[in-house]
Amino acid sequence: MIDARAVISPQAQLAPDVTVGPFSVIGAQVQIGSRTVVGPHVVVNGPTTIGEDNRIFQFASIGDAPQDKKYRGEPTRLVIGDRNVFRESCTINRGTTHDKGVTTIGSDNLFMAFSHVAHDCVIGHNTVFANSVAMGGHVEVGDWAILGGLVAVHQFIKIGAHAFLGGGAILSRDVPPYVMVAGNPAVPHGVNAEGLKRRGFSEEQIRHIREAYRILYRSDLKLSDALERLTALAAERPEIRALVDFIHGSTRSLVR
C-alpha cells in the first residue's frame, strides 16, 4: 500500500507489495524489494537497492550523499539485503569513489534509533547496532557483532564476527572476532562466551577460543610471536583460523 501523501519518483522501482507511509519521499534510482515497509516521514535516495522484508521506521534517511568533504556528487551506491530493521532517525549513507563506491549492509541486522552507518561501510549479517552508534567511513563489521549504545567507531576500523562492544566504547583500533571490549579508549575484556553459546558454539570450541584469547592478550608475547602460536593451533581449529585471518588483515592494529 502506497499512502497518497507519499512522494515517489516515477523512476523508482518498488515491488507491488511494498508499503510506504505518509509524507515519505522515495527518490529516483531506488529499488525496493517485496514486503518491505517504509514508515512515515522516511527519505530514501539513490542509487540505492533495498531487498525484501525490510522495515524502515519514521524519520530515517537511507541512501543520501556521504558526509565526506571530498565527495563531488559521483554516482555511488547503497546496497541493503533482506529482513533488516532500521529504527527511528537512522542515517545510512552511500559510498564514495575513494573506496569501492558502495556502502553494503547484509541481512537480518537491527539498527536502533539514531544509529549512523557512514560511507563505504561494510556490515555483515545478524548484527545489532544499539541506539546512537556512530560509525566513521570505511568501517567493516563482521556477522553477529553487537555494538552497544553510544559506541563511536573511527574510520577504517574492522570489527570481527561475534565481537561485543560495550555501551559508550570509543574505538580507534580493530576488534578481533569473539572479543568483548569497553571503555574510552576501548580495551579487551575477555571472550564473548555467552554470545557464542547462544549461536551454537560447542564448549570445546569456546575453550579453544579462550585459549587463543589468553595467547593473544594474557601471555605477554609480542603480537608476532602470539600470531605464530595461534597459526599452529589454527591448523585443526576453524574457529581459530578465523581469528588468525582477521589479524593478518588488520590495518589499524588490534585493541590491546
PLM ranges: what are they?
Residues 2-182, 186-187:
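Structural signal for interior beta-strand "rungs" in well-ordered beta-sheet cores
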Residues 1-5, 10-11, 16-17, 53, ...:
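Terminal amphipathic alpha-helical/low-complexity segments used for targeting or macromolecular assembly
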